[in-house]
Amino acid sequence: MMLLSQPGIWLLVSLFLCSSVNSISLWKSHPLVAGSNEPDQKRPDTPSSPRPLGITGAALLNYFEQNLRTMEVPDTAGVPQDSAYYTALTHYLGLCGARSENCDPGQSAVAKLTRDVPVLTRVHSHNDYWRRVPLLQALAYGVASVEADVWLENNGTTLLVGHNRVFLEPAHDLGRLYIEPITRMLQEVNCKSENKGDPYGIFYNAPEEQLLLYIDFKSLDRKLTYKLLLDYLKPLIDNNFISYYDMDAKRFVSRPVTVVLTGNYPSDEEIGVPSPRRYTFLDAPLGRLSSVGDEFTANNVSVVASSSLLELMLRCGKASNPSLTEQTAWESYGCLVEYVREAHRRDLRARIWGLPDWPVSTRENLWDMLTDMGVDYLNVDDLDAVSKF
């Protein structure tokens, strides 16, 4: 259903130009916006908080893609400028510039982006930072797990996001692309919350759902990367938005964001066991769980175990070269499912990556197979396709 006519396009332009426009909310009430003792007041639009358009999720992304040429995109300092699309969307969501002092979860970035969007709790946004709008595109599709590859740069003072070091850009800082927008979105939806011990999450219709944030260590100096990462995570820690394991109470405390380290991360032996709280959890080796003993204990060390499909196929003796087929995958079903069951016996979630993207029928048949096995996260590049799967 198209909520805006041609004049609506110019309305959006005027919002970016800081015009004061009144709009009618067609959205129903929600726990995030209910309970205020203050009378409702009409607030003027601000450059950092344009009024909601009334469309969310993938429809909102499509709207921006189709109408970007008619919008005047502000030049906002501190925002990656290689994409007018990214800048326009973050401006509309109110994620640019200073945070508004108004407490109005109904006009928050979470409401504008994820209202009425079903949460895809079994999907992981593979190479999320390659998307046209990192993080936000995944959230718009309801994806509850994203990843960022990080590199040490600027003499070990900065973590930049990217797959290959040669293509790193100064604007693609881990804080700007992930930590800061996540923190701001959670601050907005929790501004009225009296229960600071159980904050709302990043999905409007499912505030109890967690977002898994994978940090893939790429640099050789993993100890320094880890130390710097804790500095980056400080806004989430200070606002009580990040899950942790309480070493003294010996319990896992769930929060809106859970951080999982993967790639070249350091072991506890290298950095020391985090105390009194562990704020980052290690991606356990799904293919080697039976041989690692208690090294990756659920909740106090790890929450997820991961492996490529090819690695598991090799362990099952069904793949002798870098290629794999749908037929050999199905032939390995009995062996593959045991790895998933071993993870579940240890109270770990299972993620399998490295599925072929083509042909589409093969990819979707393998999605079916992994889902049937009980795999908790499908590693996905095509979010639109998996949202219709």
Swiss-Prot record:
InterPro entries tied to this protein: AIM6_PI-PLC-like_dom (IPR039559), HAT_RTT109-like (IPR051236), PLC-like_Pdiesterase_TIM-brl (IPR017946)
PANTHER family: ALTERED INHERITANCE OF MITOCHONDRIA PROTEIN 6
Alphabetical UniProt keywords: Signal
Cystines in this chain: none
Leader sequence segment: 1-23
Example of a GO biological process term: lipid metabolic process
Any one GO MF annotation of this record: phosphoric diester hydrolase activity
Protein name: Altered inheritance of mitochondria protein 6
